[in-house]
Amino acid sequence: MRKYTFIGILILMAGLGAACEDQLNALPGQSKVEGNVILDQKTAEVALNGVYYRFADGGDDRGTPSTMWASSHEISPGLLTGYIRYPYGSVAMEENSSLTANDYSVANLWSGSYKIINAANGVIKQIAEVDDNEFVGDRKNEIIAEACWLRAYGHYNLLRYFAQFYDQESKYGVLLRKEFVTSSNIAQSRSSVKASYDCILEDLDFAERYAPDENRNIYVNQWVAKGLKARVLMMRGTEGDYEKVITLTKDIIEKGPYELEENLKDIFKEKGLASKEVMLGIEPFVNQVRHYDDYAYREEPAYLRTTTDTLLYENDPRGEWMRGAIGEGEGITKYLGNQVEVCYAMRLTEMYLLQAEAIVRSGGLLSDAKALLKEVMGHAGITVFTELDAIADRDELLFEIYKETARNLMLEDGIEWSALIRLPMERILEVKPAIREQNYIILPIPADEFEKNPVIGDQNPGYSKN
């Protein structure tokens, strides 16, 4: 079984000729070099696994190898959206407009994305120089495709958090990195929003075409490439994008190897990665406890639910198991159970909800969107749809789709934040008044970036560089 290992082109591996299984289960080395470590398919697989290790935010937790996905992918978006809060005072992400370029969590979101991108660039560059005969069948292109997906994911994260994603004409796009960073090329300006979308979609086109048709659900395949492309096109929302989202998600739902879990709760409490609904998940290391501690540290809630969260789950059966008592407080219990250490990057439920949103936004039949929404809600234990059936207004149905997206996919991969900031500003402020204005649906570029890369360009509007 492959395990996440940070190799890439950054790690000097001891005993490169050892068994592949041993390599993939080894801890990262300490010596970092820019060396040619991809020599054949075997070493390419190890290097690719290093990119997945970065994707999972692998590291060391009190001496135990652990995946630390939750911090940036679950907790930060939950704070930004206003559904959870820190129990001991407050943190800047709870008051969006008070964030600064020196915020630690903002820096983690930024640097984590570039770690994925840089590791992916190393694989893409190195593997291109290896003879095709060193690979079995189409595996060379498949590895490049998986690395392209991971690079696209990193750039997508930066686009949704740090760029004016909603304006194709904006200069406030992503600092795109398509080459492995060295001292000679670290100085680079950020690109436009249009160029950012073009770069991400180019990588996803390659991934969709060449990624494996089948792969364990902790690795990328063609269906996962289609899923991320649907996310990106929904965020862009230009002419024809919603129709493409409908086509992509229909293809995944009707032809892909996934099924909605009969009972949503079973994914988190019993099945984990064994669920056929999980398109892409994060496999934990043996003996790690990091994800449990992210929500129930020392048997007390690490984060509390907010009033907004309480209202969201009012009269919803999920409120009985996704939230609950932890010690003396009302905390987040969604993950607590037999599969507590597993995290989720993409589930089939999201494809249903993206399709429903795209139908409404493209002027399609509200009844079609409602049917998709009912399917998802039914698997979550909802049996009465009187209020949903009564909705006749397109904007109201969009908001209902948003609320189901938040209820179902909250604290997984920032889906609740991405869905919120696609709404009109008045709706955004209804959910999270602390955002105040449009500038604050975007985060500040970390101050450290302006020191390392002074040619990057302007800070995002509403923030200072330090």
Labelled PLM ranges:
Residues 4, 20-71, 453-466:
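Acidic, glycine-rich segments characteristic of secretory precursors and extracytoplasmic regions
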Residues 34-35, 62-82, 163-171, 175, ...:
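Short, surface-exposed recognition loops and adjoining beta-strand edges that mediate ligand/DNA contacts
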Residues 46, 65-66, 242-349, 382-388, ...:
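Hydrophobic-face positions in mid-chain alpha helices that act as interaction patches
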Residues 86-162, 204-215, 338-348, 358-365, ...:
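Conserved, well-structured interaction surfaces
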Residues 117-120, 197, 204, 242, ...:
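Inward-facing hydrophobic residues that define packing positions of alpha-helical scaffold repeats
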Residues 138, 161-198:
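Short coil/linker segments at helix-helix boundaries
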